[in-house]
């Protein structure tokens, strides 16, 4: 087995890797001695759905599962009630335990679309953090100083601005680090925004003398559909892993050619050699970028749905955009009495608010019965309408007297 080749795939797309020698040794020991190793990634269930940005870490862990890794998928049901302060400019609102547990349950079903279930352990950090007790918390806090905490950019900024920083926010990185002590993890993965917390795990493993210091793999934050900002539900530039196959396929096709290769690097399970060949074929005009994007969309959609659903999504997309046909699964709505178009777009689920609807209208993105609309004050009277925003959002509306 070519360990160097495997390591090159591990490093692919990484923003930073700490203790590469340890990772190489862990993989080597698996092939020479049959020894598995543990790789941890923590997810605070602060929202019910994961998106492709979250799956960057999952994809890397799925690769490592093929080479000896047992994934410790850690659901931060305890820390999720605090909220990770990383990158935040204000104290986060605490979530109640019931909502955290509801969100956590949905995570379990979503991650196995990427991870090998037989090589994955689902862990909840309340298991050991509830047992830590006051004495344990005091001992834990004694391992780190306030001065070190204030080295974090987000805390420093808030401290200088005299914005509130709660004590429990100081506790968050300590508790996340203690997770690595409890789990005896060999590797921890996370985004670049998690570096402080990830290094805390290494330090606490040393302090608690568990006989190992975890290596750290940091992945970059995936850009959203706009190609500029990180993928985020709040920015509406995300692709949810539970989205319908048709929507997932269409959204991936909407990304730029430049962003396509970023997605290939971070989300595709194709090898480095295969991706290099795709780039070469495009450069030599042997492969059209659109075809490469279609292949990527098929691969990712199949991962979260099925091969049949992915192929059906492609056929549906081609039918709509090549033949100017309407979606076969278009939602239908009925409304009594004439209605303001902006409100109709919200009622039909095409926009989240009338403000957003008005922005779409002013941006010339809204069509009514295939005709572009620019009048933000337009009303729909009795009749049947096909409402459309952009290339992907459709709804059929019947306005009754």
Curated annotation (Swiss-Prot):
GO BP, one annotated term: tyrosyl-tRNA aminoacylation
- Short sequence motif 'KMSKS' region: positions: 230-234
Per the UniProt entry, the Enzyme Commission number(s) are 6.1.1.1
Catalysed reaction, written as an equation: tRNA(Tyr) + L-tyrosine + ATP = L-tyrosyl-tRNA(Tyr) + AMP + diphosphate + H(+)
Q: Where is the S4 RNA-binding domain?
A: 339-399
The protein's enzyme class: ligase
User: Would you tell me the Gene Ontology cellular component terms?
Assistant: cytosol
| Cellular location(s) | Cytoplasm
List UniProt keywords, sorted A-Z: Aminoacyl-tRNA synthetase, ATP-binding, Cytoplasm, Ligase, Nucleotide-binding, Protein biosynthesis, RNA-binding
Q: Give the InterPro entries listed for this entry.
A: aa-tRNA-synth_I_CS (IPR001412), aa-tRNA-synth_Ic (IPR002305), Rossmann-like_a/b/a_fold (IPR014729), S4_RNA-bd (IPR002942), S4_RNA-bd_sf (IPR036986), SYY-like_C (IPR054608), Tyr-tRNA-ligase (IPR002307), Tyr-tRNA-ligase_bac-type (IPR024088)
Kindly state the positions of the motif 'HIGH' region in this protein: 45-54
NCBIfam families, per database record: tyrS (TIGR00234)
Q: Which PANTHER family match?
A: TYROSINE--TRNA LIGASE (PTHR11766:SF1), TYROSYL-TRNA SYNTHETASE (PTHR11766)
Q: What does this protein do?
A: Catalyzes the attachment of tyrosine to tRNA(Tyr) in a two-step reaction: tyrosine is first activated by ATP to form Tyr-AMP and then transferred to the acceptor end of tRNA(Tyr).
Family designation:
Belongs to the class-I aminoacyl-tRNA synthetase family. TyrS type 2 subfamily.
Q: How does it assemble?
A: Homodimer.
Protein name as annotated: Tyrosine--tRNA ligase
């Amino acid at each position: 087995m070519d360990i160097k080749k495997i390591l090159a795939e591990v490093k692919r797309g990484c923003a930073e890797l700490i203790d590469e020698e340890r990772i190489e040794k862990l993989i080597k020991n698996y092939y020479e001695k049959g020894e598995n190793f543990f790789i941890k990634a923590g997810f605070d269930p602060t929202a019910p759905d994961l998106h492709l940005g979250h799956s960057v870490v999952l994809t890397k862990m799925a690769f490592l599962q093929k080479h000896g890794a047992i994934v410790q998928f850690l659901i931060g049901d305890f820390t999720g009630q605090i909220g990770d302060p990383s990158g935040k400019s204000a104290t986060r609102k605490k979530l109640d335990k019931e909502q955290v547990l509801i969100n956590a349950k949905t995570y379990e079903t979503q991650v196995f679309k990427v991870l090998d279930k037989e090589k994955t352990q689902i862990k909840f950090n309340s298991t050991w953090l509830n047992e830590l007790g006051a004495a344990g918390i005091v001992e834990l806090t004694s391992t780190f100083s306030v001065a070190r905490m204030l080295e974090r950019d987000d805390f420093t900024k808030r401290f200088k601005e005299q914005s509130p920083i709660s004590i429990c926010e100081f506790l968050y990185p300590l508790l996340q680090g203690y997770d690595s002590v409890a789990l005896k993890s060999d590797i921890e993965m996370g985004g670049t925004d998690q570096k402080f917390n990830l290094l805390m795990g290494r330090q606490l493993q040393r302090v608690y003398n568990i006989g190992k210091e975890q290596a750290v793999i940091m992945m970059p934050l995936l850009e959203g559909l706009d190609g500029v900002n990180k993928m985020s539900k709040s920015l509406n530039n995300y692709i949810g892993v539970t989205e319908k196959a048709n929507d997932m396929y269409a959204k991936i096709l909407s990304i730029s050619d430049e962003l396509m290769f970023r997605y290939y690097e971070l989300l595709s399970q194709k090898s480095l050699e295969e991706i290099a060949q795709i780039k070469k074929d495009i450069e030599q005009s042997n492969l059209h970028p659109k075809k490469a994007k279609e292949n990527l969309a098929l691969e990712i959609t199949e991962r979260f749905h099925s091969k049949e659903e992915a192929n059906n999504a492609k056929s549906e997309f081609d039918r709509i955009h090549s033949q100017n046909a309407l979606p076969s699964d278009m939602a239908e709505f009925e409304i009594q009495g004439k209605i303001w178009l902006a409100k109709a777009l919200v009622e039909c689920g095409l926009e989240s608010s009338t403000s957003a609807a008005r922005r779409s209208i002013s941006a010339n993105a809204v069509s009514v019965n295939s005709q572009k609309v620019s009048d933000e004050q337009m009303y729909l009277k009795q009749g049947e309408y096909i409402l459309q925003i952009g290339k992907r959002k459709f709804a059929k509306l019947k306005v009754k007297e």
